[in-house]
Amino acid sequence: MKNYNLSDNINRSNILTEESNHLSKNIDTVSTSKLVDIFVEEDKKPQQAISQAKHQITKSIDLIYQRLIDNGRLFYIGAGTSGRIAVLDAVECPPTFCTSPELVQAVIAGGSSSLINSSEEKEDSNSLSIKDLKERNFSSKDCLIGITAGGTTPYVLSGLNYARNIGALNIAITSVPEQQASFGSNITIRLITGPEIIAGSTRLKAGTATKMALNIISSGVMIKLGKVFDNKMIDVSISNKKLFDRALRITSSLLNIEMKEAQLLLDQAKGSIKVACIIKSSGMDQKSAFALLERNNHNLRKALKDINIEF
């Protein structure tokens, strides 16, 4: 334990995520079945919190989308569990949507080592987050989502302040009400899940709600960017056998063709489902199909409409 001084302590007992949950009082004395019942009941609250924050989540998707089509990027920033949840979402974007690793990035206090080793003390730094963002050339064109369940994390708060000061879109995600934490951000998404089953352990309900929110935000933005057609991930990066199979099935399904023809088309299209669909639907060659996509911001539906093909 480091030498902390009581005189420097901030009493967080009034913060919602630090309060004691009366439903889990004496949880260490109940049966395993009762323990699980408590978790099952309490884990309904993240979904309710997401529903209540629908307006803010919707607005976030629209504003982030506008930034990204203007060559901006999306950053998440967090410490501890919040940072790890951010990484979970960001690293899935390249394989799912074939994005550059630069487009959606997670910045976690303590860096990559914090993914497997706790470095909670890093969250107390007011300067480290600014340094981390500057190292990634974070600019006014970009977006920053700062995640702090209790609303007090210096690493995240200073990052949000920096984003605001340089004119970047800044969005806060927290699990406490406004009277307990006010951020001055463009948008604040308040996921009010209440006191945790284990008091203060925000990896539980607050963490679950945060992951749900990030799922919706990143997926929503990618859908608007044309990374999904119908409900299929047509920009999937074919990087393993499972994803090769998925690409085959998507191509086969969209074009109503056999798997063998789907593979031939994907080979011709250099692995791009979008290009394969244009080649098959229009008779274009690979180069012309790709050029058509580029003219339509890589949006397959718009590209097909551009050549009067209804899909």
From Swiss-Prot:
Group of enzyme by EC: lyase
Give GO terms: molecular function aspect only. Answer: carbohydrate derivative binding; carbon-oxygen lyase activity; ether hydrolase activity
Q: What is its EC number?
A: 4.2.1.126
Q: Which InterPro entries match?
A: Etherase_MurQ (IPR005488), Glucokinase_regulatory_CS (IPR005486), MURQ/GCKR (IPR040190), SIS_dom (IPR001347), SIS_dom_sf (IPR046348)
What keywords tag this UniProt record?
Answer: Carbohydrate metabolism, Lyase
What PROSITE patterns does UniProt report for this protein, alphabetically? GCKR, SIS
Catalytically driven reaction(s): N-acetyl-D-muramate 6-phosphate + H2O = N-acetyl-D-glucosamine 6-phosphate + (R)-lactate
Q: Where is the signal peptide?
A: none
Single Gene Ontology BP term?
peptidoglycan turnover
Pathway note = Amino-sugar metabolism; N-acetylmuramate degradation
Q: Which SUPFAM superfamilies match?
A: SIS domain
Q: How does it assemble?
A: Homodimer.
Q: What more does the entry say? A: A lyase-type mechanism (elimination/hydration) is suggested for the cleavage of the lactyl ether bond of MurNAc 6-phosphate, with the formation of an alpha,beta-unsaturated aldehyde intermediate with (E)-stereochemistry, followed by the syn addition of water to give product.
What is this protein called in UniProt? Answer: N-acetylmuramic acid 6-phosphate etherase
The gene is murQ
